[in-house]
Every structure is written in C-alpha cells, then in structure tokens.
Regions:
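A short SAM/SAH-binding and catalytic strip from SAM-dependent methyltransferases
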Residues: 97-110
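Conserved class I S-adenosyl-L-methionine
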Residues: 1-30, 41-45, 60-65, 146
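Class I SAM-dependent methyltransferase SAM/SAH-binding core
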Residues: 33-88
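C-terminal alpha-helical "lid/dimerization" subdomain adjacent to the S-adenosyl-L-methionine
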Residues: 8-11, 131-192
Length: 204
C-alpha cells in the first residue's frame, strides 16, 4: 500500500485535498503529534510556529517513504519519527498542544478508543485537527453500498472502514467541536467521498 499511496492521491490532492491540508495545518503551533502520517503528505504544510513535531507511524513501509521527506524538512523544527500506534498512544497525559489526524481514524482498530487516547495526550485547551472520510448517512443508497462493500474494502485497503461516524465520535470522546465542515473529497470513489474536517478543543 505504501508503494502506491502517493500515486493514488495525486488527482485527489490536486482537486482540493492539498488545499484542505494547508488550511487545517496553517495555524497550528507548539508541540504537535501527528498520528498515522503515512508518507508525509502533511509535512509541507506545518508552519514555523511548530516547536516539536512527533510523527507516529506504525507501518514500516510508510516510514520508509516518510524518511526522505522528514530529512528534507528537519531544519525547520525538531521532527521525531516513532513506530507508535494509537492503542495506546505511548506518551504521558497532557504532552501535546495539537494532535493531527488526516485520513487515519478510518483504519485504526477502534476509532472511539483512539479518540479517547488523543484526548488524554492533549493539554487542556489543546487542539485536535482532523480530516476523515465518514459514513454517507445523508445518502441512503450510497450508505447501503458502503455497508455492502466494507468487508472486502477493509481487506484491500488496510483495514479502512467505510461506515464510521467519526464526526459523532469526536464530541462523544469529550471534545468541544469548534469547526466541522462536511464536504465531498473530489477525485475519489463515491464510497469514500464524504468527509468531515475541522478542529475540536480539549476543554480547559
């Protein structure tokens, strides 16, 4: 999957996904944890206000693709790469100012448990930045197709779930949802097109 990841997203990035990443990450700063950075498509969008960036990528093939991008940007701010996953996140409580997740929570074993871990490692007032594809509940026909295809899709696409309601799970994990935009991710199959993106805060 790592070998074809960037090629798979070329058209999607050009059709607006790259702009979404830039807008989401342009205002983050301080100590940042990104879970599941994959090949590092977010790296170019982190601003100089970041003082420390930890990239938690459990897939060794993704880490191999990530390494040269990290090396190219390491002079901007300290970057650490770890093989950590989210079950649990191996950092102390209240360790980070920001946690970033883009197209990750669809494929973790338990997205609700992952959100609780994200909440735990954020400092009070910290920001959770997210971009995730979700269940197309507003389109019954498409939602039925998601349900039918999901068992095979998970096996083909690295445990990617099509029917998760991550937009509902975020506030359920204790976050204050500040911004959540629901929009179609162009140049993708219809079953993964509906997305939610924005940010939520850990209450002070």
């Amino acid at each position: 999957m790592a070998a074809m990841y960037d090629r798979t997203f070329v058209k999607t990035e050009a059709a607006g996904l790259r702009d979404w990443r830039a807008a989401l990450l342009g205002e983050v700063g301080g100590e940042v944890l990104e879970i599941g950075p994959g090949t590092g498509l977010n790296l170019e969008h982190y601003p100089a206000e970041v003082t420390r960036l930890v990239l938690a990528e459990p897939d060794r093939h993704m880490r191999a693709k990530l390494a040269p991008k990290v090396e190219a940007r390491a002079a901007r701010f300290p970057i650490e790469v770890t093989d950590a996953g989210v079950d649990p996140i191996p950092f102390e409580a209240e360790s980070f100012d920001v946690v970033v997740s883009t197209l990750v929570l669809c494929s973790v074993p338990d997205h609700e448990a992952a959100l609780i871990e994200i909440h735990r490692v954020l400092r009070p007032g910290g920001r959770f930045v997210f971009l995730e594809h979700v269940a197309a509940v507003e389109n019954p026909k498409r939602h039925r197709w998601q349900q039918r295809i999901e068992p095979l899709w998970k096996r083909w696409a690295g445990n990617c779930h099509l029917t998760r309601t991550t937009d509902l799970a975020i506030p359920a994990a204790g976050f204050e949802l500040v911004e959540a935009r629901r929009e179609s991710m162009r140049q993708t199959p219809p079953i993964v097109r509906v997305t939610t993106r924005g940010y939520a805060l850990k209450p002070v």
